[in-house]
UniProtKB/Swiss-Prot annotation:
Source lineage: Eukaryota, Metazoa, Chordata, Craniata, Vertebrata
Family: Belongs to the eukaryotic ribosomal protein eL27 family.
GO CC terms of this entry: cytoplasmic side of rough endoplasmic reticulum membrane; cytosolic large ribosomal subunit; large ribosomal subunit
GO BP annotations, alphabetical order: erythrocyte differentiation; translation
GO function term, MF aspect, one: structural constituent of ribosome
Protein name: Large ribosomal subunit protein eL27
Pfam families for the chain: KOW, Ribosomal_L27e
Protein purpose: Component of the large ribosomal subunit.
SUPFAM superfamilies, per database record: Translation proteins SH3-like domain
The keyword Ribosomal protein appears for this protein: yes
Gene source species: Danio rerio
Assembly and binders: Component of the large ribosomal subunit.
Length: 136
């Protein structure tokens, strides 16, 4: 079977506090490491989705409703469901990497980077499906 968990692939989180959320793989580790001896992936995802906007709303209200809350986390492959979709959101690999989990300040910075890039992409109107809440 081919390797399909690749950077840029959209995945659904199946377990934990982010269950049901969409995320994108930043880095995949198929063979595991010494501290995590199982296949896992570093993902950046959406914790709070942007709310619906209509044409009658003002600029201020639209700006407020277009906010996104992001998360950055390492997941076991068993807790991720890959989708057929891919997004090419260019997250800065120097900011979003596995070392951010050692220091809370770095983790905040990584989350901020993901949030900014997600909001940027959302405002362009591309990858609409990625920014919609999964109805279940």
């Amino acid at each position: 079977m081919g390797k399909f968990m690749k950077p840029g692939k959209v995945v659904m989180v199946l377990a934990g506090r982010y269950a049901g959320r969409k995320a994108v793989i930043v880095k995949n580790i198929d063979d595991g490491t010494a501290d995590r001896p199982y296949s896992h992936a570093l993902v950046a995802g959406i914790d709070r989705y942007p709310r619906k906007v209509t044409a009658t709303m003002g600029k201020k209200k639209i700006a407020k409703r277009s906010k996104i809350k992001a998360f950055v986390k390492v997941f076991n492959y068993n807790h991720l469901m890959p989708t057929r979709y891919s997004v090419d959101i260019p997250l800065d690999k120097t900011v979003v990497n596995k070392d951010v989990f050692r220091d809370p300040a770095l983790k905040r910075k990584a989350r901020r980077e993901a949030k900014v890039k997600f909001e940027e992409r959302y405002k362009t109107g591309k990858n609409k499906w990625f920014f919609q809440k999964l109805r279940f």
